[in-house]
Design a protein with these regions (language model features):
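N-terminal glutamine amidotransferase
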Residues: 1-125, 130-133, 137
């Protein structure tokens, strides 16, 4: 078996991402928690959940396993919401620090959002230069 065959025959998992929309306000925080718990095998370095309640975003993230980061008290403090996004990280680049945990909170004059992704920006420098030329501030 060649090295390529060995590589292609193995499971290649990276971060786990979970999202939910519930206009009736079903327990979004609990759904995100259980979704991340089920995806935790994809990344055990850090995890986070962000919940949007009528435009107000609450977020909690930290290093560690889902069950360690999200105690009952933390989950209750997040409150209700209609939209939730969760992320558990498997680092392929970057340091193992809480600053690299997701979801990312983005505050903009046109509104706020939480973003979780499963990948790496391989052309971050190029994108930054391009956007700065168009007037975007980083």
């Amino acid at each position: 078996m060649s090295m390529t065959d060995r590589w292609e025959s193995k499971l290649h998992e990276e971060c786990g991402v979970f999202g939910i929309y519930s206009p009736d306000g079903a327990d979004v925080v609990s759904a995100c928690y259980h979704g991340l718990y089920a995806l935790q095998h994809r990344g055990q370095e850090s995890c986070g959940i962000a919940v949007n309640n009528q435009g107000v975003i609450s977020c909690h993230k930290d290093l560690g396993l889902v069950s360690s980061v999200f105690t009952r008290e933390v989950l209750e403090a997040m409150g209700p919401g209609q939209i939730g996004v969760g992320h558990c990280r498997y680092a392929t680049t970057g340091s193992q620090v809480v600053e690299n945990a997701q979801p990312l909170l983005i505050r903009h004059r046109k509104g706020n959002m939480a973003l979780a992704h499963n990948g790496n920006l391989t052309n971050a420098g190029e994108l930054r230069r391009e956007y700065e030329l168009d007037g975007t501030i980083f």
